[in-house]
Amino acid sequence: MATNLRGVMAALLTPFDQQQALDKASLRRLVQFNIQQGIDGLYVGGSTGEAFVQSLSEREQVLEIVAEEAKGKIKLIAHVGCVSTAESQQLASSAKRYGFDAVSAVTPFYYPFSFEEHCDHYRAIIDSADGLPMVVYNIPALSGVKLTLDQINTLVTLPGVGALKQTSGDLYQMEQIRREHPDLVLYNGYDEIFASGLLAGADGGIGSTYNIMGWRYQGIVKALKEGDIQTAQKLQTECNKVIDLLIKTGVFRGLKTVLHYMDVVSVPLCRKPFGPVDEKYLPELKVLAQQLMQERG
């Protein structure tokens, strides 16, 4: 059902203007930039997209714009997760209407829901997605929901689930999931362990830093397919040097600043309460943008 979803998927950023409104022109440029750099697909409206500081209407606008720019060109996964099941269902219906290839949802958070309530939440979204496969999104560090291996096994075998985004540093668990579910589409979620995640059984990845250097991650995939571990390690190291800087700056605002210097995003701001990048990092980010543009050619 979801085998066509394998690959390298950029977790799309959401550009805003100086007034904190959605910057539609920059969003369109960013989608095209990702297509041009050879990304297999886009994961829209997730953590990287600052979904949880947007209104439902804004999230729907983002889905619509991305579909207009990319439908039929690359694979599109709509993250529709909300704490509210009804709002998640509304976004899932919109994703179906706009022509997305799949939906995804983080486990509902903040309140201490039971595991059966989590399952019911996913069943309801799957029903509203009307045939689109579900990508379960496991990110315990941000959601606060720490699923056991048995619970993950239950979620990924719910009717309608076709994939799992595993944003966890537990590579042993990644391998266990692959061993238990050989046909499940399995995404690595932490960019800094992308190569290791592939070796542990992931089919590809969904990541934020793919927005600025997606070709490097495609290079890792190619190298590992060819058995060239040395090249894969070298590329992962180069990616991680960038990630080291972004962790210092704040990942999302750092990425937007790099894309600003690449003339893709007009305003390098995240939505409040996120603040701007500390000015002391701007020279390094500008040099990084220049280096990546030169490398990409």
Curated annotation (Swiss-Prot):
CDD domains: NAL (cd00954). PANTHER family: N-ACETYLNEURAMINATE LYASE. This is N-acetylneuraminate lyase. GO terms for biological process: carbohydrate metabolic process; N-acetylneuraminate catabolic process. It catalyses: aceneuramate = aldehydo-N-acetyl-D-mannosamine + pyruvate. GO terms for molecular function: N-acetylneuraminate lyase activity. Homotetramer. Pathway: Amino-sugar metabolism; N-acetylneuraminate degradation; D-fructose 6-phosphate from N-acetylneuraminate: step 1/5. Aceneuramate binds at residues 47-48, 167, 189, 191-192, 208. Belongs to the DapA family. NanA subfamily. It is found in: Cytoplasm. Transmembrane segments: none annotated. GO terms for cellular component: cytosol. It comes from the Bacteria. It comes from Escherichia fergusonii (strain ATCC 35469 / DSM 13698 / CCUG 18766 / IAM 14443 / JCM 21226 / LMG 7866 / NBRC 102419 / NCTC 12128 / CDC 0568-73). Catalyzes the reversible aldol cleavage of N-acetylneuraminic acid (sialic acid; Neu5Ac) to form pyruvate and N-acetylmannosamine (ManNAc) via a Schiff base intermediate. It is an enzyme of class 4 (lyase). Its EC number is 4.1.3.3. Keywords: Carbohydrate metabolism, Cytoplasm, Lyase, Schiff base. The keyword Cytoplasm applies. The active site is at residues 137, 165.
